[in-house]
Amino acid sequence: MKADNILQTIGNTPHVRINRLFGDQHHVWIKSERSNPGGSIKDRIALAMIEAAEQSGALKPGSTIIEPTSGNTGVGLAMVAAVKGYKLILVM
C-alpha cells in the first residue's frame, strides 16, 4: 500500500483468519486494529472526530483542539492534529 500521508493508512488494517481455535467448522476472522499507525482502534475515532468537526465548521485551520484523555485516543488525536496542522492540548 502506498499512501500520501499517515492518515490514509488508518483503518486499512489486515483481516486475519483464526485457524486453530475453532477448527474447520467455523470461519472466524479478526481485524488487526493494532496495525493502525498509532497502534490502536482509537486512531479511527480520532480521525473521525476531527473530520466531523472540520465538516461541521466547528474546526477551522489554525484552531487549537483541547481534549481530556489519558490513553490511546490522545495518541490518535496527536497524530491526526499534527498531520492536519492543528495545535492540540491534552488534559486529564
PLM features: what roles do these ranges have?
Residues 1-92:
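PLP-dependent amino-acid enzyme catalytic core
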